Amino acid sequence: CDDPYESNFFKYFVIHFQEFGLKKLIATCYAASQVAYTQFPVPDVGEENRAEKKSSKIVITQVGQVTPPDTAPSDVAALLKNPNNQLSLLEGDGDFRSQECLELLEECDLVATNPPFSLMKEYIPLLIQRGKQFIILGNLNHITFREVKPFVLEGSMWLGYHSGHFWFRVPSNYEAKGTDYKQDADGQKWRRMGNSCWFTNVDIPKRHVPLTLEAVYSPQRYPKYDDYDAIECGKYREIPADYRGVIGVPITYLPYHCPEQFEILALVTPKIDGKSKYKRLLIRRRPENGGAEHGQPAEVP
């Protein structure tokens, strides 16, 4: 789902093609490329198709020496000089739900992309139902979607490395902002997006590192919810080390979740004194990590 002429995802995997031992790299373009039909024409598409700027796919099976970090669009033209690499038009518009794109998906072992955020509720279920490994850029609030939430709760999807505020390059015509915006010495404009994260089902060592907990439970510090048998913990750093009942934590806890330490029970919108809190993950300490009775603080030696 990335235009090979403009996508940094494509450039990254071209640079590391040999290092990663890749057999094939496939990229499809939904929106017509602003580069492919101008600076570096798509070969053999015909004038009619060129005028329509139809979507295309590129299949790379051989990559020579690439000098990082720069891979300009001209590298695509160089890649296509190798007869083993091919760029061709798609029959449809490149929608990931189309039959031809689903057939391309079946060829893949791993999907890495920045999907349309508005379609995340369709994209993530598709990848999981098709049994594909994936590393995709998203927003932490996507876990609150009804279609996405079950995969977090059942442990079939989690967060990868890095989350929070990400800086993204934006076009030159992007309007300057008072906050979360900058322009570097080269004139490149940047926009910072909060709550950005990587969704994945690829296991990583970070996922199995338990949180170091130092806070101590007290009823005054951790009030109970009106509608759930759980206590409120407003920050993941303040999870009480001596509590073995159900704890409500913000969704910002998720990057630090260790499945061997806690189980995720639900995603809810609880109330305290009649006032709704934002979405909370209800978590509980794994039995092997504690022995106190449900809802009671453990004894601290």
PLM regions with names:
Residues C1-A112, P116-P301:
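Class I S-adenosyl-L-methionine-dependent methyltransferase catalytic core
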